[in-house]
Amino acid sequence: SIYVYIKRKNRVYSKNKIVVVEKEQLKNTEFVIVADDCWGAAVYQWYGRSYNSPFAGVGIYGDCFIKLLSDFDEYMKKELKFVTETKYPQRPLNYPMALLGDVELHFTHYKTKEDAGTKWERRTQRMLEVTDKDNYFFKMSDVWGASEENYEAFHKLPFKNKVSYIPKN
């Protein structure tokens, strides 16, 4: 119908106009998104920005994500070690997986460990150039099996910018 057509055109026009305004507002602002799933990559794409985070295209189970964030700076100094077995058997490993210390990182959007490792290193360096933690945004959802305890722990972390998406019962 013509109504649906107009509604779609308006949505595309509005989206493009909003993005232009938001891009202008963020022009000189570097920000880092640390998410437990691919959400951060979508935000960087929306704004046409380089990935300032190695977590783009990476999934992290709830317990591991809380462990990582609880000692974030120390974990980010660790080296990736690619492995072939996971402690979370819910999902078949048909993608590269690595340990960062004892935290599992699931590179679900990568074909090879070489590609995953190269992008991890490059994006980690880019992330570490953003030294003001007030420009870091942390996001958690239930996509990778976060529990209620994980959400509670997440919101007790000392980071300024946190958001979580919790499913309704």
Question: Which residues fall in each region the model found?
Answer:
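Generic serine detector
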Residues: 1, 14, 50-53, 70, ...
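Positively charged, amphipathic N-terminal segments that serve as targeting/anchoring signals
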Residues: 19-29, 35-140
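Short amphipathic alpha-helical surface micro-motifs
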Residues: 13-17, 118-121, 144-147
